[in-house]
Amino acid sequence: MYNKSISKIDIVQDIAKELPVPPVISYFLCDCWYVSEKIINTFAAKGFRTIGALKTNRMLYPFGFKKKLSEFAVLLSVTCSDFNLVTVKNQKYYVYRYEGKLNGIENAVVLLSYPEKAFGNPKALRAFLSTDVSLSTDEILSHYACRWPIEIFFRQCKVHLALDGYQIRSAQGIRRYWLLMSLAHYMCVAGNGEFCSFENGYHQISNIIQMEKYRYLFQCAKASTDFDSFIKLAV
């Protein structure tokens, strides 16, 4: 669906440039691959602030000294006294709030986070960035958490609805495909008469379609006297 010779950063920048200016405070939510100076500045030019995950090898400047985020977290994690215990969607995390410079970003908030039961574990360390420094720690994490349903939607569409399996060149074609894909997703969630998870609905509909195929083949077999006549009916 896109020219693979063009970088993802360039694609996201082009998308950002086409967005209308938001009428209210709005945020670009992203994973760590898109937290770059170019993308942040492009969205900022359109009126969007950025909230995203951050790689733990990014450089921070705490107290004016250059330090890799993961190394800074190790120094802080000797005790949890510098961390606040925060609850997001019923899950608790120890969070340290840094505000200051990053490479390519003059001023932003960076949150260093550990799950409550994995404090100080380097493998459990997660970091998040917000270019809106006026947001509280809870607000940043709550906004970022809104990304997950969107992420799950796209993953479901890629795995089950062939989102990444088509090459469509026209804008009208893309809009039509998007409409059909969204309708198919909705049918999986609500098409059985009651709301259910996408996975359950998808498997239920798949089973119904498969049973209809078997029923059709069975009817063809009943109406046939030999293999050749069966093939004529079934194919």
Task: Enumerate the predicted regions with their spans.
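Single, function-defining residue in the core of a domain
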Residues: M1-V235
